Amino acid sequence: MPIIKDYLAAALLYNLQILPDSLIMGTVVLAILLTNPTVVALAAGALGTQALTHAVGSLVMAYQPDSAVPRSSLDICTGGYVGQSWARLFRPGTAHLWHPLAPSVYMATLGYFTAAGGALSQIYKDEIDAGVWPRHTLIACGVVSAILLVLALTFRYASGCESLFGAVIGLLFGAAAGYFGAVILAAATGRRGTNLWGIPLLRDRINNGSAVYICPGRT
């Protein structure tokens, strides 16, 4: 059907193109509007992951310049509205930008958000097991995240934007940053710095002689 080819397929491809930009900008806007420290930490971690991935890619290009790929700032592989605007800021309209073979900043961004969400399900396992947060919601989020990852990886590889090696390395790099970043922040802040869901935290009172979980501050 023409509508599927001309509109739905094009809309899907464009949304996949700008997916990392959408996640980054959405998180940054929420951090500004809500002034919520946990959202600010998530946004800062995402931006830091992108910067670190780009730095690693620059080192790869420095030691293996032949592996770099030239791309136009208007290329579909450059990114969406944020990526293209950033590219145009430092380059004339169609000037080529050099991209490393690995790691993929695109996949690193998706890996960061996915792994950070997975880390939260472990950090707040006691609350989830106690029914404070519905488990079916987490399962649904996990399924959606997996589908998006597969679609994004397929899109980038089929479009020639990434090699399979670069995409997987970027995904693992971002996942490591998201997971360990969340775990470290949770340990440093008593799990309050990662409580994006705003769920009441439970405290183990076994050491006090009672096998009861209660909300902190209500003893």
Q: Where do the protein language model's features map onto the residues?
A:
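Terminal transmembrane helix and immediately flanking juxtamembrane interfaces
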Residues: M1-T219
